[in-house]
C-alpha cells in the first residue's frame, strides 16, 4: 500500500506527540486532508474524516495541492506518510500525521508536528484498516482537543491506564498475535479473561461500537525485518479511549504483534 511518496526517518519518533507549542488557532483554521492518490487508503481516510471529524473545518485536497500550500501558515494538513526507521532497509509503516503549514518548510519534517499515529503497513494492507482507522482518527481529534489549552506533552498523558479497564471485555485479534505466542498460551490467557478471536470478529465488534469492549490493533511492516518497528494498540470500541499503545523494535522477524508479556500485562488487569 503506497501512501505519499514522502519517506521520513523518524518523524516525531512516530508517536502521538507534539512539539511544545500552543496551537490555539487550530479550531479556527481549515485542515486540509491530503488524498495521495492511493486507491486503498484514500477512501478510508475520506470516510473516517467525514464521519468523525468535528474539531475544525476541513477540506480534501491532492498531494499536488499540499505541495503548493505547505508554506501557508493559515492551514493545517492531515496526511499519510511512510516512515523508515533507522535500522530498516525500507519504510515499514504508514503514519497518519497532522502538521501545520510553515513558511520555510521544504518537507513534512520541517513543519510543526501536531499529532502522528501509526495506521497501517507501508505497502501491503492487513485488511483491518477500514475498521480501525476511523477510531485512530478520533483518537487524534481527542488528543488535540485535550491539548489545546496548554503545552502538548505527548501521548503518555492521553493513554488511559489499563487498571481502569477492569469490567471491560478485551478482544485480541488472532492476526495481532506474535508468532511466538502458541495455542497453549492462548488458552491460558482465555481462562484469564482475554477473548482471542478472528480479525473479522474483532473488526465487527469495533465497527458496531460494542459497549465496554477493548479491541486490539497491530501496525507493523507486511514483511518485518530486524530493526522494524511494531505498534500494539488497544482501543475502546465505543468511546475510542486509548488503553494500550506500545512500540517495539524487532530483534527477529517473528516478533511482530502482541507478545506473551503484553498479554500477561493486560490479563493481570482483568
Predicted regions mapped to residue ranges:
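A generic short-segment signal for beta-strand/edge and adjacent turn/coil regions
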Residues: 2-3, 44-45, 140
Amino acid at each position: 500500500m503506497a501512501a505519499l511518496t514522502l519517506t521520513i526517518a523518524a518523524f516525531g519518533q512516530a508517536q502521538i506527540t507534539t512539539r511544545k507549542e500552543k496551537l490555539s488557532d487550530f479550531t479556527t483554521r481549515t485542515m486540509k486532508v491530503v488524498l495521495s492518490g492511493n486507491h486503498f487508503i484514500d477512501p478510508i481516510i475520506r470516510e473516517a474524516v467525514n464521519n468523525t471529524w468535528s474539531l475544525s473545518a476541513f477540506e480534501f485536497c491532492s498531494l499536488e495541492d499540499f505541495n503548493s500550500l505547505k508554506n501557508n501558515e493559515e492551514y493545517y494538513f492531515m496526511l499519510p506518510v511512510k516512515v523508515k526507521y533507522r535500522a530498516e532497509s525500507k519504510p515499514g509503516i504508514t503514519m497518519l500525521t497532522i502538521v501545520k503549514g510553515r513558511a520555510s518548510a521544504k518537507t513534512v519534517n520541517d513543519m510543526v508536528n501536531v499529532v502522528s499515529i501509526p495506521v497501517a503497513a507501508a505497502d501491503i494492507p492487513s485488511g483491518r484498516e477500514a475498521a480501525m482507522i476511523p477510531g485512530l482518527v478520533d483518537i487524534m481529534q481527542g488528543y488535540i482537543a485535550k491539548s489545546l489549552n496548554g503545552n502538548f506533552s505527548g501521548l503518555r498523558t492521553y493513554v488511559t491506564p489499563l487498571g481502569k479497564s477492569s469490567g471491560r471485555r478485551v478482544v485480541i485479534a488472532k492476526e495481532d498475535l506474535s508468532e511466538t505466542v502458541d495455542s497453549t498460551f492462548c488458552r491460558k490467557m482465555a481462562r484469564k479473561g482475554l477473548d482471542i478471536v478472528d480479525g473479522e470478529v474483532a473488526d465487527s465488534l469495533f465497527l458496531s461500537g460494542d459497549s465496554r469492549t477493548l479491541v486490539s490493533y497491530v501496525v507493523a511492516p507486511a514483511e518485518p525485518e530486524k530493526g522494524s518497528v511494531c505498534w500494539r494498540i488497544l482501543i475502546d470500541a465505543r468511546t475510542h479511549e486509548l488503553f494500550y499503545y506500545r512500540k517495539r523494535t524487532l530483534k527477529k522477524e517473528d516478533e511482530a504483534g502482541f507478545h506473551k508479556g503484553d498479554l500477561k500485562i493486560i490479563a493481570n488487569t482483568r
